[in-house]
């Protein structure tokens, strides 16, 4: 577990370990975990939530290749990444980079997103950490709590419909309340095996799926039907999704895989 984020606008602090029990596994055991434990704890519970591809439960994982506690959480996310009723997103933070290994997918923007959640009272800046629907913060080693949070999140009620056509994203009318932020997320849906050559995970090969590569703020939505331009991705082979989120680090009121 690591406290405090490295962000140009917020200063830096060295990661600090806190003691807690966690199982570290690798190789075939990691793959077995992805297929069994996470399925029992998180995936099966999500099946009864009523969520769908048109309004999935959003599960964000904040992790780092430099964090020895993160591989089991990565495996849990990988296990649910293919579900149509869940939008699983893996954000690589940067505050571990100075401890021997620079994360190959890390971005200060992703670190700042986790800090925004902490500032909004949703957990603390720590790795690994899950945030479910922008509302529930879950310690990344607690698979049972992750499954419970996914089940509590359920399907969105009264959320606006989101669609994409050609080069546009359209959000239909809905009850917005306060203006909400519209985010475009581009992520890699493939499983990537990354050899780690230094740091706490040095000598291991970590499996990543649904790694976020782009996070773009499209604008605000206030309840009326709105259209935003959909620019091409900077990388080929990326999947896209839209999030509608209240405030900074607030609840996610709607989401759609495009």
Model-assigned labels for residue ranges:
Residues 33-35:
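C-terminal motif of bacterial Sec signal peptides marking the signal peptidase cleavage site
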